[in-house]
Amino acid sequence: MNVLSCSINTLNGLYDLSGVEVGQHFYWKIGGFQVHGQVLITSWVVIAILLGSATLAVRNPQTIPTGGQNFFEYVLEFIRDVSKTQIGEEYGPWVPFIGTMFLFIFVSNWSGALLPWKIIQLPHGELAAPTNDINTTVALALLTSVAYFYAGLTKKGLGYFGKYIQPTPILLPINILEDFTKPLSLSFRLFGKILADELVVVVLVSLVPSVVPIPVMFLGLFTSGIQALIFATLAAAYIGESMEGHH
């Protein structure tokens, strides 16, 4: 009887687990288009957190920074170092772009683990981290692509396209394909990591007591921060590469 009872409990747990759905969306109709409402909601929350915390931190700037001002100046210095290392001496104009990418992705990733999105009920789907949706990560990757094309064209003009036949015209298809694979690799790496992290936590919570997934959640927080850094570093590296013209 104990074996039978145990088997039934296991099957019930697996049945509950099979009810976990991925990919349901809450749509808003804007004009003739359908947009993912839950992505916009969570993105607005993340933007509000960033703007609110930055405003509070620098509302009374001090010559000798303390508290929140000190923290944000440290973050700015860190982003400047990353940008300078990857882009070179002309990094200055790109610090806001790289910093925005890093902070948005970082806070988005952490919001998936720290904010109780599920208490907000939607007619369809559920709220989750913005980077848990492929549309967000693809949009961020496409922005990066536009940025490095803009950087290259601004620096070299139409001569920028000469890189596609370097070191030999035979490599033209490969060099073109490389520029298309950059946004794909950026978007799918970030999306896959965040989605996999949330699914692992859901699976463990469904099968084992709630205290067991806690170490996995802490690991997820760490790797989420690393993913934000990787995305920002690669974006800066691509921009620097387009300006210098080397691979």
UniProtKB/Swiss-Prot annotation:
Q: Does the keyword Ion transport apply?
A: yes
What are the record keywords, sorted? ATP synthesis, CF(0), Chloroplast, Hydrogen ion transport, Ion transport, Membrane, Plastid, Thylakoid, Transmembrane, Transmembrane helix, Transport
> Where, subcellularly, is it found?
Plastid, Chloroplast thylakoid membrane
The portions of this protein that span the membrane are: 38-58, 95-115, 134-154, 199-219, 220-240
Which InterPro entries does the protein's record reference?
A: ATP_syn_F0_a_bact/chloroplast, ATP_synth_F0_asu, F0_ATP_A_sf
Query: Which is one Pfam family of this protein?
Result: ATP-synt_A
Query: What SUPFAM superfamilies does the record tag this protein with?
Result: F1F0 ATP synthase subunit A
Write out the GO cellular component annotations: chloroplast thylakoid membrane; plasma membrane; proton-transporting ATP synthase complex
MF term (GO), any: proton-transporting ATP synthase activity, rotational mechanism
Question: Main localisation, per the record?
Answer: plastid
Does this UniProt record's set of keywords contain rRNA-binding? no
Q: Membrane topology type, per the record?
A: Multi-pass membrane protein
What does this chain do?
Answer: Key component of the proton channel; it plays a direct role in the translocation of protons across the membrane.
- To which protein family does this belong? Belongs to the ATPase A chain family.
Quaternary arrangement and interactors, per the entry?
A: F-type ATPases have 2 components, CF(1) - the catalytic core - and CF(0) - the membrane proton channel. CF(1) has five subunits: alpha(3), beta(3), gamma(1), delta(1), epsilon(1). CF(0) has four main subunits: a, b, b' and c.
- NCBIfam families for the chain: ATP_synt_6_or_A (TIGR01131)
Protein's recorded name: ATP synthase subunit a, chloroplastic
What organism does the record attribute this protein to?
Guizotia abyssinica
